[in-house]
């Protein structure tokens, strides 16, 4: 009664008055409650499904027991497994039995791949990722693609085995246990070039560098062997050790030539990362408005060094700024589950994952079992598509192992 006349007419208008509901609606309160429980179950899988993923190729860290991923946690019974519910899965809303939904959730969120999206803030980005993660129409690799991946995998393994037997005791920082990174990087170069990228700059530490030099950048193996044998020409090169060396080459892909540069690396882990992104930014600015579409930065991290060194926090912090942003960096973690001599999680860090630092910039985080080469390459393709669409960072955590520890871990590890 105290409102002005025009506001009273507004609230009393027919459009806002309560309408009676037809009595032939047979949906019961119990049914609505179960439907709400199914929605909660789906959300639980999307936020906590990564805890159930099969990520460790050694099986030393089995998937966690997560009560909220079980229907019973939300009040659903075995009798409900055959009942159909309305669900939004991927990009579609449909009716399906609860049992079928559980199988789809398990496949999408707890296989060889695991996704962390709960820290993302942008609804468009979340929906984009959900439509791809939960898609049942994901393209499968054809025979020729699988053969190419196998050849890259064998090339990586063969090189490491040869160096191990030919140059016994020499430092080489083997990639063994994480060889799937090589077919993944090969997939990366082909996908980026198909998207129109013409230059890629890589920053990485020493582990796996020799393999990347030979099996990605096509460095002549004879030149690498000469470095092992001390046969370099006096006065040529920088005189630095072989696992610090940079290189550049033009890689031929089905979509054309891609120039790839691997930055030189000092022994101080991760310190090269801002240097690489500075190079990327300079190359982009030289190209003008479409620079971010033509030049991409790729950073390859170690698991303990990623969160352990402050330079990475600073690099992430500047990644979206006007003066230093590069339109998204592709981060790849060679996670061999051992930081120098420390393999127990409680001795390494205070967070569950080594990639948790990336949550500060709301970057999607993908964990993948390094022994599933097809899964590793599949998420690499997804990462390229993400960067091309949103111009933001994304991080892939390849969970693998270190085949040769250099000495007995019982001597090298801290006492406990």
Predicted regions and their residues:
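Conserved phosphate/anionic-ligand binding catalytic regions in large, soluble enzymes, centered on
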Residues: 40-57, 187-216, 301-321, 391, ...
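Extended, charge-enriched "interface" segments that sit outside catalytic cores
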Residues: 3, 10-181, 197
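Phosphate/diphosphate-binding loops
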Residues: 87-91, 223-231, 343-346, 358, ...
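Generic secondary-structure signature for well-ordered alpha-helical cores
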Residues: 110, 114, 155-158, 190-194, ...
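Active-site pocket-lining segments that scaffold enzyme catalytic pockets across diverse folds
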Residues: 158, 162-222
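Short alpha-helical segments and helix-capping/turn motifs at coil-helix boundaries
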Residues: 37-40, 88-89, 102-103, 113, ...
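Cofactor-binding active-site loop characterized by glycine-rich and histidine/acidic residues
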Residues: 198-370
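Electropositive phosphate-/nucleotide-binding environments in soluble metabolic enzymes
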Residues: 95, 99, 179-182, 266-273, ...
């Amino acid at each position: 009664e105290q409102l002005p006349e025009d506001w009273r007419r507004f609230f009393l208008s027919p459009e806002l008055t309560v309408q009676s509901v037809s009595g032939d609606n047979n949906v019961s309160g119990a049914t609505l409650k179960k439907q709400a429980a199914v929605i909660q179950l789906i959300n639980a899988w999307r936020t906590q499904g990564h805890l159930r993923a099969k990520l460790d190729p050694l099986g030393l860290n089995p998937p966690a027991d997560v009560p909220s991923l079980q229907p019973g946690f939300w009040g659903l019974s075995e009798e409900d497994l055959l009942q159909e519910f309305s669900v939004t899965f991927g990009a579609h809303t449909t009716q399906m039995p609860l049992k079928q939904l559980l199988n789809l959730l398990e496949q999408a969120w707890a296989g060889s791949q695991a996704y962390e999206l709960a820290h993302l803030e942008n609804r468009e980005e979340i929906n984009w990722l959900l439509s791809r993660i939960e898609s049942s129409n994901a393209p499968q690799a054809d025979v020729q693609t699988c053969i190419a991946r196998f050849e890259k995998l064998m090339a990586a393994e063969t090189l490491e085995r040869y160096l191990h037997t030919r140059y016994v005791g020499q430092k080489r920082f083997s990639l063994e246990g994480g060889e799937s990174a090589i077919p993944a990087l090969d997939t990366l170069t082909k996908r980026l070039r198909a998207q129109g990228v013409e230059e890629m700059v890589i920053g990485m530490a020493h582990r796996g560098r020799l393999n990347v030099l030979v099996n990605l950048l096509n460095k002549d193996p004879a030149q690498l062997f000469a470095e092992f044998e001390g046969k370099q020409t006096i006065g040529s090169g920088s005189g630095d050790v072989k696992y610090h060396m940079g290189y550049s080459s033009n890689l031929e892909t089905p979509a054309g030539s891609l120039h790839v540069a691997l930055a030189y690396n000092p022994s101080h882990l991760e310190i090269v990362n801002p240097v690489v992104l500075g190079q990327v930014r300079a190359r982009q600015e030289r190209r003008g408005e479409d620079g971010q579409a033509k030049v991409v930065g790729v950073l390859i991290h170690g698991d303990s060094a990623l969160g352990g060194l402050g330079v990475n926090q600073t690099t992430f912090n500047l990644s979206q700024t006007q003066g230093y942003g590069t339109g998204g960096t592709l981060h790849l973690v060679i996670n061999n589950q051992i930081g120098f001599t420390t393999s127990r999680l409680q001795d390494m860090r205070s967070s569950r994952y080594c990639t948790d630092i990336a949550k500060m910039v709301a970057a999607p985080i993908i964990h993948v079992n390094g022994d599933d080469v097809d899964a590793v390459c599949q998420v690499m393709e997804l990462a390229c598509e993400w960067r091309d669409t949103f111009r933001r960072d994304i991080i892939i955590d390849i969970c693998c192992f270190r085949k040769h520890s250099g000495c007995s871990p019982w001597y090298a590890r801290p006492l406990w």
